[in-house]
């Protein structure tokens, strides 16, 4: 039913999606997560098609600061304290910024260590960067931190792409059983943030 973290990280390293579940007492949601450096146009289209469509790109604070991407607001009133930064698009090779091609390109360039100039991105845009806590899931058990921790475990640039799964029949958020069924249908491994936390603790 649930994959081991080792199996999940291997898939993640190969550029495959994972479904990551948080605790039922938290958001009780499953996010599709993929490494930012790997995401293709086709995968971005899949992500948008089966999710809320509000694609976010978690990354380290160091990466955000190096690209001079500020936080969206000074006073964060989000219930889960999700750390939204100013939206953006990659400046070269995109048109409106909203297409699967453009969003995938922007995400890959955010993950590209050779892209170092803030001027390479236009703001506002259609990708929502998220600032992960430095301590990862051990500091905050959110999908933001899970995405960055998975990148680190896979030896990839610490930039992911995430979006919440929704049910096709009614558009409501996918819960545990929905996520398990979706993963089985599409061959996507499912893990929990709790198991990721335990795995990371075991490596310390």
Swiss-Prot record:
InterPro entries: DHBP_synth_RibB-like_a/b_dom, DHBP_synthase_RibB
Enzymatic reactions: D-ribulose 5-phosphate = (2S)-2-hydroxy-3-oxobutyl phosphate + formate + H(+)
Quaternary structure and partners: Homodimer.
Family recorded in the similarity comment: Belongs to the DHBP synthase family.
The keyword Manganese appears for this protein: yes
Site (Essential for catalytic activity): 126, 164
Changes after translation: S-glutathionylation is reversible and dependent on a glutaredoxin.
Binding site for Mg(2+) 2: 27, 143
One GO term of the biological process aspect: riboflavin biosynthetic process
Modified residues (S-glutathionyl cysteine): 56
Domain of life: Eukaryota
One GO location term (cellular component): mitochondrial intermembrane space
Pathway: Cofactor biosynthesis; riboflavin biosynthesis; 2-hydroxy-3-oxobutyl phosphate from D-ribulose 5-phosphate: step 1/1
UniProt remark on cofactor binding: Binds 2 divalent metal cations per subunit. Magnesium or manganese.
Annotated D-ribulose 5-phosphate binding sites: 31, 82, 140-144
Role this protein plays: Catalyzes the conversion of D-ribulose 5-phosphate to formate and 3,4-dihydroxy-2-butanone 4-phosphate.
Binding sites annotated in the UniProt record for Mg(2+) 1: 27
Catalytic activity, EC: 4.1.99.12
Keywords, comma-separated and alphabetical: Glutathionylation, Lyase, Magnesium, Manganese, Metal-binding, Riboflavin biosynthesis
Pfam families, alphabetized: DHBP_synthase (PF00926)
UniProt KW Cell division keyword: no
Protein name: 3,4-dihydroxy-2-butanone 4-phosphate synthase
EC class (word): lyase
UniProt xrefs under Gene3D superfamilies: DHBP synthase
Alphabetized GO MF terms: 3,4-dihydroxy-2-butanone-4-phosphate synthase activity; metal ion binding
Necessary cofactors: Mg(2+); Mn(2+)
